[in-house]
């Protein structure tokens, strides 16, 4: 049976949620599931804004047929061609053979790659700030290349002032009845997933997100309808500010994240002692993660949130411990900038991982690397407490 939500008098949400999927993009854990949002506008012309993942295709078509209530579908606006949003375009075309696909020129090759139906004779190609009148409503189209695919664009309803933001302003997490962000405690229950979604999916493309935010700032926006997560109709500025912070690589919090790898517990012990000394110096916002049991997406996200980062690891086969190396390479791939970073290294012989960890961060922009690396030979010796104290002081003094 259909399950739809009314967004405005003539706009409906016809998406759904997947709580069975373990890994988003087969990479990122989503214990709270994920929603795939799609919207239908009932104007003089009917408009579908994006489709959904194949996993909820049955519900999607029930919802679409229910909302159309016997009307044909005139337009399908394709804001983003990633398969979790475009998977059923071919089925839409088969069910509604007269539908026109509204997209930009970069979308056309992707349509041909994913689907076998003739594309050119059913597409309406739009460019920056082109418009489409559907009766009462007029859509304007804003290109958003590499947020986070090259063909991405957003659509703006100039009448109701609604931004259909594609993957922008999305979040992990299934919709549990409440569609609107103001109906839930977003900061408590959704913000961590919103941050982890943005940082891991889009975080590499901060410059491109900043460009889109500048374009959006010229529009009067009363509502944001993303392709994942809740719809925003209140307090939009708060969430937009989060995106501005994340995409400009500014720390969200004055906080210390300590990520450690430990084979037999000795490096963990050193990390615990450092955290205790930081707390003694008045540092209140400290987060600790064991990289062997914490998914890298969490640590990458926390690296964007926190102003100060500490990485503690043993040397392993002459290099950085495998799980730590994975995390650091992921942080590097997301082009993190503007952090204060400290290191602790361990090894029973040939301790080299501290130098190698530093080299990774030396290649990133705006990094303040604290020179006083703590070097441990197997286990932290009693005489080394002063070294940990000195490192704690160096971190605390820069906060």
Each model region followed by its residue ranges:
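Conserved beta-strand hairpin/beta-sheet module of binuclear metal-dependent hydrolase folds
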Residues: 4-65, 154-157, 161-165, 267
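Metallo-beta-lactamase
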Residues: 5-9, 103-152, 208-211
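Active-site metal-binding motif and surrounding structural segment of the metallo-beta-lactamase
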Residues: 44, 55-102
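Structural motif
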Residues: 45-47, 75, 137, 161-164, ...
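Active-site neighborhood of phospho(di)ester-bond hydrolases with catalytic His/Asp-centered motifs
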Residues: 49-51, 73-81, 101-104, 163-167, ...
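Short acidic active-site motifs
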Residues: 88, 294-299
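Active-site-proximal loop/helix segment associated with metal-binding centers of metalloenzymes
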Residues: 148-152, 168-203, 247-252
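FMN-binding flavodoxin-like domain, especially the glycine-rich phosphate-binding loop
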Residues: 175, 186-224, 228-231, 273-289, ...
């Amino acid at each position: 049976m259909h399950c739809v939500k009314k967004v405005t008098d003539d706009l409906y949400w016809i998406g759904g949620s997947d709580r069975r999927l373990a890994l988003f993009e087969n990479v990122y854990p989503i214990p709270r599931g994920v929603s795939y949002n799609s919207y239908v506008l009932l104007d003089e012309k009917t408009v579908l804004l994006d489709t959904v993942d194949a996993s909820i295709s049955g519900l999607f078509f029930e919802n679409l047929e229910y909302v159309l209530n016997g009307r044909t579908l005139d337009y399908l606006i394709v804001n983003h061609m990633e398969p979790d949003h475009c998977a059923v375009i071919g089925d839409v075309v088969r069910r509604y053979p007269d539908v026109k696909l509204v997209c930009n020129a970069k979308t056309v090759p992707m349509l041909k790659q994913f689907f076998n139906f003739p594309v050119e004779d059913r597409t309406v190609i739009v460019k920056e700030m082109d418009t489409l009148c559907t009766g009462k409503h007029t859509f304007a189209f804003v290109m958003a290349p590499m947020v986070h695919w090259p063909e991405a664009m957003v659509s703006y309803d100039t009448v109701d002032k609604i931004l259909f933001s594609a993957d922008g302003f999305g979040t992990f997490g299934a919709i549990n009845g409440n569609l609107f962000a103001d109906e839930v405690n977003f900061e408590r229950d959704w913000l961590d997933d919103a941050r982890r979604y943005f940082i891991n999916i889009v975080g590499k493309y901060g410059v491109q997100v900043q460009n889109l935010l500048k374009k959006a700032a010229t529009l009067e926006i009363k509502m944001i309808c993303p392709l994942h997560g809740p719809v925003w109709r209140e307090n939009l500025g708060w969430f937009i500010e989060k995106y501005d912070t994340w995409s400009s690589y500014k720390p969200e919090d004055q906080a210390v994240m300590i990520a450690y790898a430990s084979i037999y517990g000795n490096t963990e012990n050193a990390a615990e002692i450092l955290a205790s000394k930081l707390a003694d110096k008045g540092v209140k916002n400290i987060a600790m993660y064991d990289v062997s049991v914490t998914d890298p997406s969490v640590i990458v996200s926390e690296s964007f949130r926190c102003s100060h980062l500490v990485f503690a690891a043993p040397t392993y086969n002459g290099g950085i411990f495998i799980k730590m190396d994975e995390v650091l390479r992921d942080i590097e791939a997301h082009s993190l900038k503007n952090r204060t970073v400290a290191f602790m290294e361990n090894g029973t012989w040939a301790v080299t991982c501290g130098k190698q960890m530093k080299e990774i961060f030396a290649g990133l922009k705006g990094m303040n690397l604290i020179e006083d690396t703590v070097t441990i030979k197997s286990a932290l010796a009693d005489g080394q407490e002063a070294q940990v104290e000195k490192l704690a002081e160096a971190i605390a003094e820069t906060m």
